[in-house]
Amino acid sequence: MSEIPEHPRPRRLAHWINPTGARKVHSLIDKVYQKKNLEMAWEKVRANKGAGGVDGQSVADFELQRDEQLDRLHRELRDDVYRPQPVKQVPIPKAGKPGEWRNLGIPTIFDRVCQQALLNRLEPIFEPEFDDASFGYRRGRSPHGALRKVWKEIEGGSQWIVDADLRDYFGSVQHDKLLALVARQVADGRVLRLIGAMLKAGSCEGRHYTSSEQGTPQGAVVSPLLSNILLTPFDREMRGRGYRLTRFADDWVVTCETARQAKEALVAARHILSALGVELHPQKTRIVHVRYGFEFLGYKIKQGAKPLHLPASKIRSGVRNGALYAYPRDRSIQRLMDQVRRLTRRKVPLTTVELIRELNPTLAGWGRYYRRAHVRRLFHRLDAWIVRRLWSHRFKRWRNVGWKRLPESLLYGEYGLVNLIGLIPSIAASRSAST
């Protein structure tokens, strides 16, 4: 695994926040409500965009009153009268699970700026405390870094996998345990009360208010950091016992050399997580050999014994017995196809150029995430299917006339449709060299 790049700015911030190097930071709230910090927080919230919360105020609305809003937030935090509003609960479909939904908690823009300002000051304090096993929501780390680590461990002989899932992690976080862990590094009582108020702000769905005695809302700016804080003792304890843990937020695996070691690792994980108030999902936690495959961060990783079940294509992507392969999991493929279907329905009142403009961000993001996997056949098939969807939308029927009036050369050339197979590094390099 490549070295994680160092970033001097967080170290400088950490020194400024805690110049004495004391184990705990005693004075932090004044650095949270510092006007420059609030301005930086607002710029981050504005760049991320997103919908408004329960007060109905949008990012554009906030921007019209930017100075007044930031002054108000500064005063409320300084005078210790700030109170967060409930988050707006928005049900969204679970990826790859038709008919199943999860709630996304959306704070108001005002509260989002406050959370980002708090995050700006907490992150430099806690980042040095996080374990090397943790890859989620950390500067210089990524899902692909986590996947590379797991891949190398499997290639090194650790082929038994503890494939685990946490039961309703974000919804079951115990506030007292989380705040106790924050208090190990932060002794500023006002900051601790501020975090507690954010956690207990509750939620609104329509006009129905629900109090929050546990959990941290998915969608809150500070939730990823808080999730890492809560699970850091788990990371340290597992690695301290010699287990090869890799974690990205609440998604984690342990690679082991034997089935017995994997069973012991699972027992240890269950015990450590229980002490943190976190449960494993009994139906979604298993021990498996890599030859049978497991899923991690949207990928299916499997040792080849048979050809992968991918549709035939003119582009060869064979599988050798005993070799290790990674490809998008079925739910990820289905989710992409559902998005394309929705955008290319025949009744969608857009021109082909407008459709491509809508499709491209989805195709580019999905393709770049999976382009280093074993996806030549899959990308080739998806490219052909997407072109046929565009033909169907344009000519209102599934007939082989589209290629005459709307050839692929026009779609990929003048119209700029993202070509998935062209995102694969070796193919992209070959095409670049030939032009």
Positions of predicted regions on the chain:
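A conserved non-catalytic segment of reverse transcriptases
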Residues: 200, 276-351
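Core structural elements
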Residues: 33-38, 84-90, 94-96, 199, ...
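A glycine-rich phosphate-binding loop feature that marks nucleotide/adenosyl-phosphate handling sites
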Residues: 285-293, 359-362, 379-387, 403-410
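Short, solvent-exposed helix-loop connector elements
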Residues: 103, 211-216, 323-325, 341-355, ...
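Duplex nucleic acid-engaging cores and interfaces of nucleic-acid transaction enzymes
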Residues: 109-110, 114, 151
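Extended C-terminal regions of large enzymes
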Residues: 385-389, 394-435
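Conserved polymerase palm-domain catalytic core
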Residues: 76-91, 129-293
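Non-catalytic, polymerase-adjacent accessory regions of viral genome-replication enzymes
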Residues: 1-67, 71
